[in-house]
Amino acid sequence: MMDFGIYEKALPQSRDIEKVFQTAAEAGYRRFEMALDKDRLERFRWSKKEKAEWLRASLNSGVQIYNLVLSAHREFPFGSHKADVRKKAYEIMEEAVEFAAEMGIRTIQVAGYYALDSEEVTEDSEKRFIEAMHHAAGLAGRAGVMLGIENMDRDIISLDQMKKIVEEVNSPWLKMYPDVGNLSAHHFNVKQSLAENIHHIVGIRLKDTKEGVYRRVPFGEGIVDFKLVFSTLFNSGYRGYFGVEMWNDNSENSVEIIKEARKWLLQQTPQ
């Protein structure tokens, strides 16, 4: 049976991290995706005791902290027109790689944003992003942590765009982390996109979407053809990681929701 990872924001919020990991385990998940957005940057300055609490919870529950979802670059993109924003983007990446290495996290999911939402994306924006990926790949290689660029709701939206970056950087430490929901919402040929780039993929983001709606679409109610996604990946030889992206939004039945999501996704896999 497949082991799915679950996004931290899908779980009920609690100061008791042992409870968080135990909840993930009881819901059937064996891997965990840590959220690192602009409001969680203080995690980079955790004490050894704080890091140990998370690692102990992971070991006790049997749920591995596998992926770091580095969404902070939405507010601090590498290709921004503003020098101070770009400087912060580099600082975040350097801290993320060091943090992931210390926590034993295998992959860092890199948000494919060239610029701030309020800025125009130019050729210089793209060039600056690629320069940053050269730098990031060097950091990742020295730390032994994989980087995977995620296709987003804007800027980097296709696997062709990611392929251009990955091939230009040409590092074994920088690959792709396709979000099949975003691919579908942008009306790309999901089967072709995945099959043609299978050797560059280090993780798959499982999320349902609708046209123009990139978040909070319950599994099975959107436009993503998950049976096609799984069959394409398996037939192409993919045996890697799958992360389930959801948001609990303080729902009283969030645990039941993530249980049912896992059950539903398993039903979409080749029998």
What are these regions (language model features)?
Residues 27-38, 67-74, 111-112:
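Short, conserved active-site loops that position catalytic residues or coordinate cofactors/metal ions
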Residues 35-58, 112-118, 214:
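Glycine-rich, proline-tolerant flexible connector loops at the mouths of alpha/beta enzymes
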Residues 18-19, 55-64, 76-175, 185-187:
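Active-site acidic/histidine proton-transfer and metal-coordination neighborhood
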Residues 1-5, 10-30, 156-178, 182-271:
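Histidine-acidic metal/acid-base catalytic patches
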Residues 1-4, 60-66:
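Transmembrane beta-strand segments of Gram-negative outer membrane beta-barrel proteins
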Residues 33, 67, 109, 148, ...:
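Conserved beta-strand positions in the central sheet of alpha/beta enzyme cores
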Residues 43-47, 78-84, 119-124, 188-189, ...:
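Short, solvent-exposed loop/turn segments at secondary-structure boundaries
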Residues 38, 72, 114-115, 154-155, ...:
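Conserved beta-strand edge residues that scaffold enzyme active sites
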